[in-house]
């Protein structure tokens, strides 16, 4: 039978932890450094988690109807995750992004069936956001999921990524480090970890020109 054949969205999450032994040794660290291998997600990044979460949240709230159009301004991996989940669930996806984004990323989301609308590079993400809003206003029943402000983003990490890290380390975690884009990953995971142990130290890594 097909008992061991999974739908692609079922492969999102439950990623393994890998000990970075050589790195720890090179830095003379006594405590092991462990990485969560989020590129094992089918779309290749942690953003698969929130793509699935935001779409399912919109479905449950009745905001997103079957066969509707999803619109999202994105220059990163969220677009890949949304393209993957939209393809599986039968939604039309339009991604607005600055023309400065790589051709490889554009081709990847197109391979999943997404439509790409490029905006002026000099307008940056604000230009992509404006284009997305104009599209939403012109396409009946369309939805912008809004990863930067959508509570389903941190909630997904609180419900899944945080508990996975805690369980797989048997609670033996002193410091949690994460890169910051929307802030959803670090805030959701940190909330869960600190509820288990208030002494866990949380460190955010962000580029110098971050909006945070």
How should each PLM-predicted stretch be described?
Residues 4-212:
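PLP-dependent amino-acid enzyme catalytic core
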């Amino acid at each position: 039978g097909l008992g061991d054949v999974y739908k692609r969205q079922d492969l999102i999450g439950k990623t393994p932890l890998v000990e970075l032994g050589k790195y720890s040794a090179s830095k003379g660290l006594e405590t092991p450094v462990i990485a969560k291998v989020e590129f094992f997600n089918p779309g290749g990044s942690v953003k698969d988690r929130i793509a699935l979460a935001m779409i399912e949240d919109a479905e449950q709230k009745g905001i997103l109807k079957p066969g509707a159009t999803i619109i999202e301004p994105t220059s990163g991996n969220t677009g890949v995750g949304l393209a993957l989940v939209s393809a599986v669930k039968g939604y039309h996806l339009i991604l607005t992004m600055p023309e400065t984004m790589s051709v490889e990323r554009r081709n990847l989301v197109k391979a999943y069936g997404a439509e790409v609308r490029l905006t002026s590079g000099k307008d940056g993400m604000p230009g992509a956001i404006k284009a997305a809003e104009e599209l939403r206003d012109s396409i009946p029943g369309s939805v912008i999921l809004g990863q930067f402000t959508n509570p389903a983003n941190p909630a997904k990490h609180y419900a899944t990524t945080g508990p996975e890290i805690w369980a797989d380390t048997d609670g033996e975690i002193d410091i949690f480090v994460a890169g910051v884009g929307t802030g959803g990953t670090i805030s959701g995971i940190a909330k869960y970890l600190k509820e288990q142990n208030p002494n866990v130290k949380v460190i955010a890594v962000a580029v110098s020109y971050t909006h945070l």
